[in-house]
C-alpha cells in the first residue's frame, strides 16, 4: 500500500469514527493555495478542522509529524473556509488531530485529539 493509499484509508476510517459520534462531514480534502484540510466536520456549534496522520506502527507516533508550519497552513485554510461557509462565525472553530496507526495494511488504532492545536503563536512562523 502506498503512503497516499494509506492516507486515504485513514481519512475514510476517521470519517466513519466521526459519523459514529454524531458529527456531520461537511468537506473532505478542502484545498486552497498553500494549504489543505483533511476533514471538516460539524457537531452542534463546533466546526472541527481535522488533520489526519497515518503511519505504520514501526514509523513512530503519527502526530510527531504535525509541524508548526503545517498547523499554520491548516489555520489559514480554515479562515478561508469560514469566510466562505461560516461568515457570521456562528460555529466555533476547533483544530483536531488524529493519529491513525496501521500495521500490514490494517488500521491498528485511531487516537482522536480534540483541540490539538490553536492559532496562538503561529503568526511567528514563516
Residue ranges of each PLM-predicted region?
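Domain-level recognition of nuclease-like catalytic cores that cleave nucleotide substrates
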Residues: 86-126
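Residues at secondary-structure transition points
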Residues: 1, 5, 9, 34, ...
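Catalytic cores of nucleic-acid endonucleases
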Residues: 54-103
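Conserved catalytic cores of phosphodiester-cleaving nucleases, focusing on short active-site segments
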Residues: 18, 39-58, 74
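Conserved protein-kinase catalytic-loop segment immediately C-terminal to the catalytic Asp
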Residues: 38-41, 99-101
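Acidic-basic catalytic patches of nuclease active cores, encompassing PD-(D/E)XK
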Residues: 1-28
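Short acidic/glycine-enriched loop/turn segments that link adjacent beta-strands
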Residues: 32-35, 106
Amino acid at each position: 500500500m502506498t503512503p497516499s493509499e494509506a492516507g486515504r484509508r485513514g481519512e475514510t476510517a476517521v470519517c466513519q469514527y466521526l459519523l459514529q459520534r454524531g458529527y456531520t462531514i461537511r468537506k473532505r480534502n478542502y484545498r486552497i493555495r498553500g494549504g489543505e484540510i483533511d476533514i471538516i466536520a460539524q457537531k452542534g456549534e463546533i466546526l472541527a478542522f481535522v488533520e489526519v496522520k497515518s503511519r505504520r506502527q514501526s514509523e513512530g507516533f503519527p502526530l510527531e509529524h504535525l509541524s508548526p508550519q503545517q498547523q499554520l497552513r491548516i489555520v489559514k485554510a480554515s479562515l478561508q473556509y469560514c469566510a466562505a461557509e461560516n461568515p457570521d462565525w456562528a460555529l466555533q472553530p476547533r483544530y483536531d488531530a488524529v493519529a491513525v496507526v496501521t500495521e500490514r495494511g490494517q488500521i491498528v488504532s485511531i487516537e482522536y485529539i480534540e483541540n490539538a492545536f490553536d492559532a496562538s503563536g503561529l503568526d511567528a512562523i514563516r
